[in-house]
């Protein structure tokens, strides 16, 4: 079960999430609806560890996900594919690629092989141009 308890998050002193709590049971499907800027993407990115939360707790079963990249927690079993095929500049190229693998429950053997051939994949996206 995914348990979110009282999470809050801010960007540049602007509160984006304030005291968000919800429980999602295994097998349950949840849709997030809201206007632009309501915090839907921030909530999803918070669950994935891509956005820092200021307070509260995010747990999947007994694993606390706060401030961790979800794809680095094997027992987590969740992935996130951003709309519009966006990448995350704060992550390494390798981590961006792994996001898609975890979302599809795919093996990362091919990715590990590619990473061994191209060391540039171990650098952060924001260090790249073009």
List each language-model region with its residue ranges:
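ABC-type ATPase nucleotide-binding domains, specifically the catalytic core motifs of the NBD
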Residues: 12, 68-70, 93-109, 119-122, ...
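The feature captures the beta-strand-to-loop junction immediately N-terminal to the Walker
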Residues: 33-35
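ABC ATPase NBD coupling module
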Residues: 64-85, 111, 125-129
